[in-house]
């Protein structure tokens, strides 16, 4: 979460909760090959003594929990869990929304309907709207692991390291002794096979050492889009 994001979240009353839970970092380092000396360093907060850090690392489910708590505290918000929007009709001065819950359908009329339901938004689908942008022909393996480690809270990025030759790797520290490793794995891969523990864990040990003790939290593949 960037400083700008935290400034916005402050306006919603949840910025401090994110900072209190998150791992603060300002410094990033870039390495090449097996060289232990970074080829480049940067500081996301060159002007010190600001209210918020350059970045914090925090799992998304914590941010969603804090935002949900803030919304639930508002007197003019009605939260309806388990309700699915299945249809909508746009009128000149309002929108008519069809909702289904437990097999029962009902309708709501509102001035505005805001699509905040992610990149596979059913709202956007009902309106035949797509996310314009570019899909990069590459895949990345996310390995979220828990382990005890004294590495500094910095963003470390490798080009062509010996533990992932010809590709890149990113390492981030997160709360609760969680570490996120992003391995670039290429385009034409078997996505299911790439996330099997017997294929992921040799990568982790090649990077962190054979003796490292860690616990799997989450392995997945993502494709970068913007």
Residue ranges, per PLM feature:
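Conserved FAD-binding catalytic core of PHBH/FMO-like flavoproteins
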Residues: 69, 92-94, 112, 116-225
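Well-ordered beta-strand positions in beta-sheet-rich domains
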Residues: 41, 107-109, 142
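Conserved beta-strand-loop-beta-strand element in the redox core of flavoprotein oxidoreductases
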Residues: 87-108, 113
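A conserved beta-strand/loop element that lines the FAD pocket in flavoprotein oxidoreductases
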Residues: 71-86
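Active-site-adjacent segment of FAD-dependent monooxygenases/related oxidoreductases
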Residues: 1-72, 89, 172
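Glycine-centered tight beta-turn/hairpin loop motif at sheet-sheet or coil-to-beta transitions
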Residues: 35, 101-105, 164-166
């Amino acid at each position: 979460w960037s400083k700008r994001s935290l400034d916005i979240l402050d306006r919603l009353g949840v910025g401090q909760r994110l900072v209190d839970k998150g791992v603060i970092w300002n410094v990033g380092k870039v390495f090449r090959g097996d060289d232990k000396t970074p080829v480049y360093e940067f500081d996301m907060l060159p002007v010190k003594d600001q209210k918020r850090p350059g970045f914090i690392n925090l799992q998304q489910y914590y941010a969603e929990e804090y935002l949900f708590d803030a919304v639930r505290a508002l007197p003019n918000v009605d939260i309806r869990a388990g309700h699915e929007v299945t249809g909508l009709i746009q009128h000149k001065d309002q929108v008519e929304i069809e909702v289904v819950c437990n097999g029962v359908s009902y309708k709501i009329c509102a001035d505005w309907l805001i699509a905040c339901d992610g990149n596979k938004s059913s709202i956007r689908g009902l309106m035949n709207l797509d996310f314009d942008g570019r899909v990069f022909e590459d895949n990345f393996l996310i390995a979220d692991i828990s382990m005890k480690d004294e590495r500094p809270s910095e963003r470390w990025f490798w080009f062509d390291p010996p533990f992932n030759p010809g590709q890149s790797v990113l390492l981030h520290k997160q709360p609760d002794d969680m570490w996120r490793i992003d391995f670039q794995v290429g385009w034409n891969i078997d996505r299911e096979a790439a996330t099997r523990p017997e294929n992921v864990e040799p990568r982790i040990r090649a990077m962190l050492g054979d003796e490292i003790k860690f616990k799997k939290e989450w392995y997945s593949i993502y494709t970068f889009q913007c």
